[in-house]
């Protein structure tokens, strides 16, 4: 399943998101959700421990001035890669 987090993790039921993640799922951070990718924040450690790959939309990182602050564990992607993820996963959960 593809999970997309478009809101700040501080304004989301992040614990519920983590509970619903399964091995093989992927999480895309976009819009204000990219703030979860900032190195050193409290949500990042939980994402590191999850059995998933985590991506962040590069355009949203740039728009928020965060490109130099994200963790190396987060994979920046562009819109083409976003489309590939949506094609790969038949189901999606938006947060």
UniProtKB/Swiss-Prot annotation:
Major localisation: cytoplasm
Q: Name one Pfam family in it.
A: DsrH
**Listed GO cellular component terms?**
sulfurtransferase complex
Q: What are the BP-aspect GO terms?
A: tRNA wobble position uridine thiolation
What keywords sit in the KW lines? Cytoplasm, tRNA processing
Q: Where in the cell is it found?
A: Cytoplasm
Per the entry, what this protein does is: Part of a sulfur-relay system required for 2-thiolation of 5-methylaminomethyl-2-thiouridine (mnm(5)s(2)U) at tRNA wobble positions.
Q: How does it assemble?
A: Heterohexamer, formed by a dimer of trimers. The hexameric TusBCD complex contains 2 copies each of TusB, TusC and TusD. The TusBCD complex interacts with TusE.
Record HAMAP family: Thiourid_synth_B
Can you tell me which family this protein belongs to? Belongs to the DsrH/TusB family.
Give the protein name, as stated in the record: Protein TusB
- Source organism (scientific name): Escherichia coli O139:H28 (strain E24377A / ETEC)
Top-level taxonomy: Bacteria, Pseudomonadati, Pseudomonadota, Gammaproteobacteria, Enterobacterales
């Amino acid at each position: 399943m593809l999970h997309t987090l478009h809101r700040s993790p501080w304004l989301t039921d992040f614990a519920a998101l983590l509970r619903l993640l399964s091995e093989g799922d992927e999480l895309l951070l976009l819009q204000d959700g990219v703030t979860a990718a900032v190195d050193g924040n409290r949500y990042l450690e939980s994402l590191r421990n999850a059995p998933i790959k985590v991506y962040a939309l590069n355009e949203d990182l740039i728009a928020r001035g965060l490109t130099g602050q994200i963790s190396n564990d987060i994979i920046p992607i562009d819109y083409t890669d976003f489309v590939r993820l949506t094609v790969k996963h038949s189901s999606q959960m938006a947060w």
